[in-house]
């Protein structure tokens, strides 16, 4: 890790990440400053402007907004046993009211998935930045174990693929 920066940035997990969660580099070479800035201006900034707009639009239209920030995670976890199928991250209650966290957990458990909360993924930038439960903006990060639906070494579908694909927010 680099010194003098935030822990995430210092370790290569800033706005333009240099490594994946296992510590392996994403790029074959160090990005030039202009390349990183171009990615921020062409991808990161427009995405976040659109997300902020959608949140405000939903607040105006419905009086509340639920943001589900969905990710996939590698299956192996040395710290967790048994390995969870799903990790729900609500920034330890700071990004989402407990009622929403409890509801989502019950829905996944009811469909036969094992669930953990906030460990090791409590929520990233989207969860922490946009979650305002006191203002009716509930944000939950959902991590889904890739091993449920794919062979992680060969990148091929597993028999469980269809069951995971059938998950729908409509059913939740």
Predicted regions, residues:
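Short, His- and charge-rich active-site/binding loops that engage polyanionic ligands
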Residues: 1-29
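Glycine- and other small-residue-rich loops at beta-strand/loop junctions that grip anionic moieties
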Residues: 5, 40, 119
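Surface-exposed cleft-lining segments at the edges of enzyme active sites
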Residues: 27-44
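Alpha-helical packing segments of well-folded alpha/beta enzyme cores
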Residues: 40-43, 47-54, 164-168
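Alpha-helix N-cap and loop-to-helix initiation/capping positions
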Residues: 43, 92, 96, 159-163
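A hydrophobic, small-residue-rich beta->alpha segment in the mid-to-C-terminal subdomain
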Residues: 143-167
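Conserved small/polar residues in nucleotide/adenosyl-binding loops
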Residues: 170-172
């Amino acid at each position: 890790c680099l010194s003098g920066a935030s822990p995430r940035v210092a370790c290569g997990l800033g706005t333009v990440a240099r490594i994946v969660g296992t510590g392996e580099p994403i790029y074959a070479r160090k990005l030039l400053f202009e390349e990183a800035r171009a990615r921020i201006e062409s991808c990161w900034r427009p995405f976040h402007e659109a997300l902020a707009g959608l949140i405000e639009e939903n607040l105006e239209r419905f009086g509340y907004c639920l943001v589900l920030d969905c990710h996939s995670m590698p299956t192996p976890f040395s710290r967790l046993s048994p390995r969870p199928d799903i990790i729900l991250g609500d920034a330890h209650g700071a990004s989402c009211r407990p009622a929403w966290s409890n509801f989502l957990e019950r829905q996944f458990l009811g469909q036969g998935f094992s669930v953990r909360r906030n460990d090791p993924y409590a929520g990233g930038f989207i969860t922490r930045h946009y979650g305002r439960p006191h203002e009716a903006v509930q944000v939950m990060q959902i991590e889904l174990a890739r091993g449920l639906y794919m062979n992680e070494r060969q990148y091929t579908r597993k028999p469980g693929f269809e069951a995971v694909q059938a998950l729908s927010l409509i059913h939740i």
